[in-house]
């Protein structure tokens, strides 16, 4: 536990009470969800969404644990969905000059990295022209 940020460690410790049966059930449920979502998303080339759903807060705004955990969960929401699916994703910077940094996330199904990179290059070119 030494070396972990206390806020990260508290999340890791949440799983300490789970047993083998709990883990197996969660793995089966995740695999079922992955199969269903993959089947639904086959007809799309990519999913487009904000990399994070809000402008990043200042460090001072996250001093209290409750504010940190609320913001952290929100910031990880979109990428976490792709991670849970075992998908692939990337983020393209797309802010206007002088504006706060924002990113456009392109996400794809598992093992579709090459196709997703092709879409990213095309979108990046269009953004550069805008």
Kindly give the residue locations of the regions a language model identified.
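Short, surface-exposed loop/helix-turn segments at secondary-structure junctions
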Residues: 25, 56-76
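Short alpha-helical functional segments enriched in proximate histidine and acidic residues
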Residues: 36, 40
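Short glycine-/small-residue-rich Rossmann-like dinucleotide-binding loops
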Residues: 52
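An anion/phosphate-binding loop that grips the pyrophosphate of nucleotide cofactors and donors
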Residues: 44
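Structural helix-boundary/capping segments
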Residues: 24, 35, 84-130
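Short helix-loop capping/hinge segments that flank enzyme active sites or metal/cofactor-binding pockets
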Residues: 1-34, 91-101
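Small-aliphatic-rich amphipathic alpha-helix that forms the alpha element of a beta-alpha
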Residues: 69-92
